[in-house]
């Protein structure tokens, strides 16, 4: 098992954001996490990456306990993440931004630069290396953040609403790119997303959160036919093609 979340609970004061969550992700898989806004999806992502410290339970990566490890140590072990709002420094170039990710494992500037340029090309931004991040459009910025995450050479990549704000043609392109990350680079993916047609087409397993509790887990077909999931999130009129925004 590549990642195991064992009874993880996270509280913010009196609010229980994650309530005894259990998640298992096998190496090479693409797994989804869905649920209404405020369900606790981003909270568990941040806990896995080390930005939050869970109050109860444990998190294991490659059978190693990473509960409460520092973020940079978790990154060096092989976990990377992207955020809904691209977390890039606006006043530096694309190449410099991705290079920062490459230095996670590389001390050689030459090798790090080689990795950075390789990932920039992989996400389709070759030729933009010297462009300031602030001048990139949303679709380009999301691909730039993906390149920076890939430059850390992760085994597991957490994608938090990577498709948010993209127009349908961009969603299609990004979906193919994400599929290539898994198939060509061998990176295991854990995806939080409201664009359900993406989740349903990419993932072999999906977890569903509501009010911090896990209410379902299964294949896309099992999830879309689950009465509790339909009531809590999908809605009675869900036809398998529409997307959720709340």
Set out the residue ranges of the language-model regions.
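Glycine-rich phosphate-binding loops of nucleotide-dependent enzymes
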Residues: 2-4, 8-246
């Amino acid at each position: 098992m590549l990642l195991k979340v064992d009874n993880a609970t996270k509280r913010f004061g009196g609010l229980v954001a994650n309530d005894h969550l259990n998640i298992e992700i096998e190496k090479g898989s693409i797994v989804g996490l869905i649920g209404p806004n405020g369900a606790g999806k981003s909270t568990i992502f941040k806990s896995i990456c080390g930005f939050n410290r869970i109050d109860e339970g444990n998190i294991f990566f490659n059978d190693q306990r990473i509960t409460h490890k520092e973020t940079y140590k978790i990154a060096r072990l092989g976990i990377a993440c992207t955020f809904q709002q691209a977390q890039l420094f606006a006043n530096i170039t694309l190449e410099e931004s991705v290079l920062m990710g490459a230095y996670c494992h590389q001390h050689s500037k030459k090798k790090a630069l080689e990795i950075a340029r390789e990932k920039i090309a992989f996400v389709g931004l070759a030729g933009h290396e010297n462009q300031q991040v602030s001048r990139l459009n949303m679709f380009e910025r999301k691909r730039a953040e993906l390149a920076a995450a890939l430059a850390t050479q992760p085994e597991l990549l957490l994608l938090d609403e990577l498709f948010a704000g993209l127009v349908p043609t961009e969603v299609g392109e990004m979906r193919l790119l994400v599929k290539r990350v898994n198939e060509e680079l061998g990176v295991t993916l854990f995806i939080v997303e409201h664009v359900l047609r993406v989740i349903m087409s990419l993932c072999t397993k999906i977890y569903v959160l509501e009010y911090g509790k896990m209410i379902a887990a299964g294949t896309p077909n099992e999830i879309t036919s689950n009465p509790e999931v339909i009531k809590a999130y999908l809605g009675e009129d869900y036809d398998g093609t529409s997307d959720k925004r709340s």
